[in-house]
């Protein structure tokens, strides 16, 4: 699967798909995500694609309601609202869905790079989205997701470190780790703090460039936002912003900018 930010040994690399190189769609890889499978149409109606006009897919995100998208801060830094659009209502980057304009970008005031602490942000849509069978919001979990829980990761991330972007949305079940286990397995404990939740399955499975900002879901509720990892699917944990840790920031930020 995809991911935009990846830690290589102890160094975090931010791979901004739009700013570095254009992501090339490749139907040959449509069934070859890193350990995942093609998501059934409509199975993740909250999933959106953050698009850069003229480039295409750059990051993932989640619809929280008809005006707000939750994503990673590093997907927003350096952009103006007019630089980004949000694709909703489709599992395909080539057809279907609707592109929506954005009128506000907000990210956590204590977002830290290169550790990627507080790597969480919000996008406000210019106009309310119309919900349908393929476009739905997702609730977020206000309590911590359990350790050793099976959670679902979706995204249009690369199928391998240097692979192309799959045309269709990919889905992968992964398992949550304790932060202590995550720090030990990551080999860089400074990158993991209370605001993170980590997942791991095995080598050959995980997030990759382009998944950043996308959703991690547990029992139908949003628990994580893709932040960082070791590219790609190499048997190291992936790190996510822990939504329960930031739920008050999310709530107040939306309320203060409604």
From Swiss-Prot:
InterPro entries: Peptidase_S1, Peptidase_S1_PA, Peptidase_S1_PA_chymotrypsin, Peptidase_S1A, Trypsin_dom, TRYPSIN_HIS, TRYPSIN_SER
Propiece residue ranges: 18-32
Marked site: Required for specificity: 206
Gene Ontology CC terms, in alphabetical order: extracellular space
Parts forming coiled coils: none
Catalysed reactions listed for this entry: Preferential cleavage: Tyr-|-Xaa, Trp-|-Xaa, Phe-|-Xaa, Leu-|-Xaa
Tissue: After blood feeding, expression is induced in the midgut epithelium, followed by secretion into the midgut lumen.
Cystine connections: 59-75, 182-198, 208-232
EC number assigned by the record: 3.4.21.1
Main location, first listed in the record: secreted
Any one GO molecular function term: serine-type endopeptidase activity
Location(s) in or outside the cell: Secreted
Family: Belongs to the peptidase S1 family.
Entry protein name: Chymotrypsin-2
Taxonomic source organism: Anopheles gambiae
């Amino acid at each position: 699967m995809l991911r935009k930010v990846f830690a290589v040994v102890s160094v975090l690399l931010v791979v901004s798909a739009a700013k570095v190189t254009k992501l090339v769609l490749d139907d040959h890889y449509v069934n070859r995500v890193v350990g995942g499978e093609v998501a059934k149409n409509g199975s993740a109606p909250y999933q959106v694609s953050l698009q850069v006009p003229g480039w295409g897919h750059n990051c993932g995100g989640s619809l929280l309601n008809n005006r707000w998208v939750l994503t990673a801060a590093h997907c927003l830094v350096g952009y103006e609202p007019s630089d980004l659009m949000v694709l909703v209502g489709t599992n395909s980057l080539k057809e279907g869905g609707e592109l929506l304009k954005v009128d506000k970008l907000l990210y956590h005031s204590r977002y830290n790079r290169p550790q990627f602490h507080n790597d969480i942000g919000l996008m406000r849509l210019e106009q309310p989205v119309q919900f349908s069978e393929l476009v739905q919001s997702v609730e977020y979990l206000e309590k911590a997701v359990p350790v050793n829980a099976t959670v679902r990761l979706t995204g249009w991330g690369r199928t391998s470190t240097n692979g192309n972007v799959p045309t269709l949305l990919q889905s992968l079940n992964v398992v949550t780790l304790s932060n202590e286990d995550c720090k030990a397995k990551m080999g860089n404990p400074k990158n993991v703090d209370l605001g993170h939740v980590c997942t791991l399955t095995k080598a050959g499975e995980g997030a990759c460039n382009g998944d950043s900002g996308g959703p991690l879901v547990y029992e139908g509720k949003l628990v994580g936002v893709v932040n960082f990892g070791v590219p790609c699917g190499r048997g190291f944990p992936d790190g996510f912003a822990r939504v329960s840790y930031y739920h008050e920031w999310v709530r107040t930020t939306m309320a203060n900018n409604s």
